[in-house]
């Protein structure tokens, strides 16, 4: 089925099964001068899911992979400034690619006592991770972004203090 239909069906299922204890949001490289559209949509999707009772907590996942900023820390700071309470957002800081995002965050969620877990990302990444999730994190449900539901027109993401996300002496993995 198409990515659009896959996202819509997953969202309909999530409506019936909400609330989740936590959602996992994979990181995207943070660029201080220009936030990417992928980062914007993932953060706005997390906010939508939090504001609409789909989840009580959010784990952002990602290390300093392609920029000198730890993706998950930057995303957490941004989401906190958008109104998701800081005590309900977490940063998983080791993951360097998609499968590590889901696996390390799933392990973190379990350590924190969360049992009802979902992955919240774009439909393409969600679909790519589906077989990995089934094999290694079978209790994780997908809630891919439904673009007709997401309202990214709400404005630009806030400017944040990136001091705590910056890695001195950073070396790209490429």
Regions found by a protein language model. Name each.
Residues 1-2, 174:
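Basic, amphipathic N-terminal segments that precede the first structured/catalytic domain
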Residues 2-165:
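A structural signal for short, hydrophobic/glycine-enriched beta-strand patches
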């Amino acid at each position: 089925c198409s990515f659009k239909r896959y996202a819509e069906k997953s969202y309909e299922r999530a409506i019936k099964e909400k609330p989740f204890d936590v959602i996992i949001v994979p990181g995207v490289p943070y660029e201080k001068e220009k936030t990417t559209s992928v980062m914007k949509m993932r953060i706005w999707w997390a906010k939508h899911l939090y504001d609409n009772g789909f989840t009580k907590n959010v784990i952002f996942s990602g290390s300093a992979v392609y920029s000198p900023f730890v993706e998950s820390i930057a995303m957490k700071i941004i989401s906190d400034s958008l109104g998701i309470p800081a005590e309900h957002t977490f940063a998983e800081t080791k993951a360097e690619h998609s499968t590590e995002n889901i696996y390390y965050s799933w392990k973190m969620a379990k350590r924190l006592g969360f049992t009802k877990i979902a992955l919240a990302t774009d439909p393409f990444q969600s679909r790519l991770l589906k077989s990995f999730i089934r094999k290694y994190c079978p209790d994780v449900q997908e809630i891919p972004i439904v673009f007709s539901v997401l309202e990214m027109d709400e404005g630009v993401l806030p400017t944040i203090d990136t001091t705590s996300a910056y890695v001195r002496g950073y070396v790209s993995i490429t």
